[in-house]
UniProtKB/Swiss-Prot annotation:
Function recorded in the entry: Cell division factor that enhances FtsZ-ring assembly. Directly interacts with FtsZ and promotes bundling of FtsZ protofilaments, with a reduction in FtsZ GTPase activity.
Organism whose genome encodes this protein: Burkholderia vietnamiensis (strain G4 / LMG 22486)
Taxonomic lineage: Bacteria, Pseudomonadati, Pseudomonadota, Betaproteobacteria, Burkholderiales
Subunit note: Interacts with FtsZ.
Keywords associated with the record: Cell cycle, Cell division, Cytoplasm, Septation
Cellular location(s): Cytoplasm
PANTHER family, per the entry: CELL DIVISION PROTEIN ZAPD
Family affiliation: Belongs to the ZapD family.
Top-level lineage group: Bacteria
UniProt name for this protein: Cell division protein ZapD
Main subcellular location: cytoplasm
GO cellular component: cell division site; cytoplasm
Length: 251
């Protein structure tokens, strides 16, 4: 099944973007070629843009504290697997401590590094990081891969508590949902939400159908419409019945 996820609010939208950026960053950082490390570095700059939002850290700390207070009363409950509960609570508490230790404006260390700032300013220009534009950057790219990797890991380290916090919140949100098998008649599906508030919707579709879900929702109803990509033209609506799995997640 192919998984598509749709956020219902701006906070989850930001966390999904952050998750995607950190996954891309980790992939390219693990590679050897300097061009791949260039992608890792420019992705780090994107991460800094997202995490630089003033209220992100405080939002994450509030949500983790809320989850801690929700889960802590289940300690000693015989109906709850205690080892798993303690693992989650320990992870939340450690991440909260790491967030509390973050000092100053998020990502300021990248701004204060004049060399990185020069690369960042050139990276937004198409072809702006050529060797004749940034000879010192080109020289750094000739260093051994492990040394480059250590440098980039050092630069991302102050942002990792935000990555860990986002991962916990998204994981708890995803685990809160229960998948149901539904059918989009003639490619369209709608469901009343009865005023319930959700953070995330997951749509899983069989890959052999080659369909693409498009979703929208408000506090009363959600809609899923399936389209199909055919060559270079825009996706078109399908008129076949599409079976899929729908999960609504609510922290």
């Amino acid at each position: 099944m192919i998984l598509y996820e749709y956020p219902f609010n701006e906070r989850i939208r930001t966390l999904l973007r952050l998750e995607d950026l950190f996954e891309r960053f980790a992939f390219f950082l693990a590679q050897e070629d300097p061009r791949e490390h260039h992608v890792a570095l420019t992705t780090l700059f994107e991460i800094a843009e997202v995490t630089g939002r003033a209220d992100l850290k405080s939002d994450l700390m509030k949500e983790l504290e809320r989850q801690r207070q929700t889960l802590a009363p289940f300690r000693g409950n015989p109906g709850i697997e205690q080892n798993a509960l303690e693992a989650v609570l320990g992870e939340i508490e450690q991440t909260l401590a790491n967030l509390a230790q973050m000092q100053g404006k998020t990502g300021q260390h990248l701004v204060d590094n004049e060399w990185l700032a020069s690369i960042r300013s050139r990276a937004v220009i198409p072809g702006g990081t050529c060797k004749f534009d940034l000879p010192s950057y080109y020289a750094w790219q000739q260093w051994p891969a492990e040394q480059r990797r250590q440098d980039i890991a050092k630069w991302v380290a102050p942002l990792l508590p935000l990555r860990d916090a986002a991962a916990i919140v998204l994981r708890l949100a995803r685990e809160s949902g229960q998948a149901s098998k539904v059918m989009a008649m003639q490619g369209s599906y709608q469901q009343m939400l009865s005023g319930r508030t959700y953070q995330l919707m997951q749509v899983r579709v069989p890959p052999e159908l080659h369909v693409i879900p498009e979703a929208s929702a408000n506090k009363y109803m959600l809609w899923v419409r399936f389209t199909m990509q055919d060559g270079d033209v825009r996706p078109r609506a399908v008129d076949i019945d599409v079976p899929f799995h729908l999960t609504l997640c609510n922290l």
